[in-house]
């Protein structure tokens, strides 16, 4: 068994973890980052996907190695690549890692414990990392949400969440039902059509969203200003918080990107707004016979659930396996965080989607990676005279 000691362990090599690593390196803080870089994005998102974010949602807290800088190095501009494809985005991240010399250890942590005023992270290979501080940047994977009442109606093995169903190589001539009517549901529908699906049905309880460009321009100034005033969101009244959350929700949920419209203009697509599944039965041929609340009966081969994500940190395996979970104060499944993303366990920080409750809905999006990195590392620098900014 090998043992490593570090001041800071970053668990997760997605957008939030990479940004923290970049800021830690900038400030000269000894750190170790573990995880396979952008694994969720590479393994749980489909090829051919486009992002809703623009090129200003980059990872660099120092605003040097931006997406625009990457494009400039290739003789391109944002206009050449927007909407930003998943492939282009991932090549930017590869470039960003090289520029920042971020080299994650591609290992998995299977449990995290506290011991004698430090943390002990155990890898699945039996190695141990001892750390004074830990940042959890868990991403979305463990928060995939399938409502219990929906799951109870579906035969076992007949459905997958969108983050699980990303390989469309066998989609040709198959019939699909997608449950959910937001961006991911419509984008999966377009990709399935392009993969040769015979039919794609979309069922959702609400009205279908409008094809319209989402306006995120108001978000970046709010998030960037949080570096100097990290508590501004939590100081708002509940109504003010709700207003911001609704505005964010309406941009992301009441609109779907117009570049999907022409891709979905097909007789093979049927959209069923204001509907839910009443029943679903697998017949002798293995086909799924589905009845909707509007009385429509459809027959499909596969059901894809675009039912979103719901935070509950108890679902993080590394916390569930260790001794820390009971020490972390939570509210509604979210960790209680201070102004620098520190939990009620001193030295343990959590960012990304679990930060939404205390920092606002922006932290479910990558435009907030720079802010969380700066605030977390600022806390560590306040405890050390060795940082560049000290």
Where on the chain are the PLM-derived regions?
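Flavin (FAD/FMN) cofactor-binding and adjacent substrate-gating region
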Residues: 42-75, 217-237
């Amino acid at each position: 068994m090998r043992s490593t000691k570090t001041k800071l362990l970053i668990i997760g090599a997605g957008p939030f973890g990479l940004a923290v690593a970049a800021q830690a390196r900038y400030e000269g803080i000894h750190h170790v980052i573990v995880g396979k870089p952008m694994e969720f994005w590479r393994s749980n998102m489909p090829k051919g996907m486009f992002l809703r974010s623009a090129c200003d949602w980059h990872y660099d807290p120092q605003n040097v190695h931006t997406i625009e800088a990457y494009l400039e190095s290739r003789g391109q501009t944002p206009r050449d690549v927007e909407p930003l494809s998943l492939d282009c985005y991932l090549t930017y991240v590869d470039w960003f890692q090289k520029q920042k010399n971020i080299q994650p250890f591609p290992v998995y942590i299977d449990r995290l414990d506290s011991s004698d005023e430090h943390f002990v992270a155990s890898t699945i290979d039996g190695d141990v990392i001892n750390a004074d501080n830990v940042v959890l940047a868990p991403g979305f994977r463990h928060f995939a949400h399938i409502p219990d009442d929906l799951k109870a109606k579906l035969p076992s093995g007949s459905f997958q969440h969108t983050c699980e169903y990303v390989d469309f190589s066998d989609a040709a001539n198959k019939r699909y039902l997608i449950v959910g009517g937001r961006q991911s549901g419509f984008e999966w529908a377009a990709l399935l059509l392009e993969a040769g699906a015979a039919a794609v049905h979309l069922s959702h309880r609400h009205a279908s969203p409008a094809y319209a460009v989402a306006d995120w321009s108001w978000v970046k100034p709010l998030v960037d200003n949080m570096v100097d005033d990290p508590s501004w969101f939590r100081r708002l009244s509940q109504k003010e918080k709700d207003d911001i959350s609704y505005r964010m929700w309406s941009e992301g949920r009441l609109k779907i990107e117009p570049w999907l419209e022409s891709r979905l203009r097909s007789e093979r697509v049927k959209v069923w707004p204001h509907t839910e599944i009443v029943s679903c039965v697998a017949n002798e041929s293995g086909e799924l016979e589905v009845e909707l609340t509007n009385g429509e009966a459809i027959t499909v081969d596969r059901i894809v659930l675009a039912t979103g994500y719901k935070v509950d940190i108890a679902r993080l395996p590394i916390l569930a396996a260790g001794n820390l979970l009971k020490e972390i104060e939570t509210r509604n499944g979210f960790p209680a965080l201070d102004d620098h993303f520190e939990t009620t366990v001193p030295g343990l920080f959590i960012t990304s989607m679990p930060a939404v409750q205390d920092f606002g809905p922006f932290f479910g999006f990558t435009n907030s990676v720079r802010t969380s990195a700066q605030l977390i590392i600022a806390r560590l620098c306040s405890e050390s005279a060795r940082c560049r900014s000290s």
